[in-house]
Design a protein with these regions (language model features):
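Residues that define the transmembrane beta-barrel architecture of outer-membrane proteins
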Residues: 42, 54-60, 84-91, 104, ...
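Outer-membrane beta-barrel initiation region
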Residues: 20-83, 87
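Residues on the lipid-exposed face of transmembrane beta-strands in outer-membrane beta-barrel proteins
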Residues: 60-64, 91-95, 110, 125-131, ...
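Transmembrane beta-strand segments that form the barrel wall of outer-membrane beta-barrel proteins
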Residues: 42-50, 72-82, 105-115, 125, ...
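Outer-membrane beta-barrel strand-turn architecture
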Residues: 52, 66-70, 97-101, 130-133, ...
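A charged, solvent-exposed segment within the mature domains of Sec-exported extracytoplasmic proteins
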Residues: 124-156
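Classical Sec-dependent N-terminal signal peptides that target proteins to the secretory pathway
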Residues: 2-20
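Flexible, glycine-rich linker and terminal segments associated
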Residues: 21-37, 144-190, 197, 203-243
């Protein structure tokens, strides 16, 4: 299991990064990753996301409990995504606590994003509340890096922003959820990037597969509305159902 996950990380990462410029970073990353995987990761997803008019995004995300009790959990979450010849590493920690009456779960988290190719960096703080039928999530994003020269020598800068999302379980379908998200980013020197995102997600029982389809509506902004589709494989669920 450990070797399989590490191999997937290696394939995704090496396929699109410059060996000459990032060899030291890759060596350090995979050395740390292998040491971290000495304790088993049970909850790891591989995803393929396709957006209308854009190249697909491929990613791997893993969730590891660090301290798990009946009433709370502290966890590490890490992911690596590649899209349009750009690789982004995301690392963070969070804590979730079960309410005294066990009717809802609430939590806080903090993450760090690093786009490896052009050295863009940002931090985020998030909060969540979940019950058996509803959930509310919000994230606030803060730029760390300054303006950089990106792909095709275009000047790029990380944007500050936030999003807030509400989700609901579909009646009589335990693995189905519906989401509505509002997002807004402050684009330096340009129009704000804002809009609404509508999506639905369903898990296929006993397969480890989740399907998500959604639509981004940018309102009257200069951005084009777009559909997106996401397919996710959960490694632990696949293994548990085939063993």
């Amino acid at each position: 299991m450990k070797k399989y996950i590490i191999t997937l990380f290696t394939i995704i990462f090496i396929s699109a990064v410059s060996v000459a410029e990032t060899s030291e970073l890759k060596d350090n990353f995979f050395h740390s990753l292998e040491n971290f995987f000495d304790s088993k990761f049970d909850d790891t997803d591989i995803s393929i996301k396709s957006k209308e008019g854009n190249k697909p995004e491929i990613g791997i995300k893993t969730f590891k409990p660090l301290n798990d009790t009946e009433s709370e959990i502290t966890f590490f979450q890490g992911s690596l995504f590649t899209h349009d010849e750009r690789e982004t590493l995301n690392l963070g920690f969070g804590k979730r606590i079960l309410s005294d009456d066990e009717s809802f779960l609430y939590g806080l988290n903090a993450f760090y994003d690093h786009e490896l190719d052009y050295d863009h960096q940002r931090a985020s703080l998030g909060a969540e509340i979940k019950s058996s039928i509803l959930e509310l999530n919000t994230n606030h994003y803060f730029a760390i890096s300054n303006e950089k020269t990106g792909k095709n020598n275009i000047k790029e800068e990380v944007a500050d922003g936030y999003d807030i999302e509400i989700g609901a379980h579909a009646p009589y379908i335990p693995t189905a959820k519906f989401y509505t998200k509002y997002f807004e980013y402050d684009i330096p020197g340009g129009s704000d990037f804002e809009g609404l995102e509508y999506s639905s997600k369903i898990g296929i029982p006993n397969t480890g597969l989740d399907f998500e389809v959604g639509y981004k509506d940018y309102g009257n902004n200069s951005y084009e509305d777009q559909w997106f589709f996401n397919l996710t494989f959960n490694i632990n669920k696949m293994n548990s159902n085939t063993s």
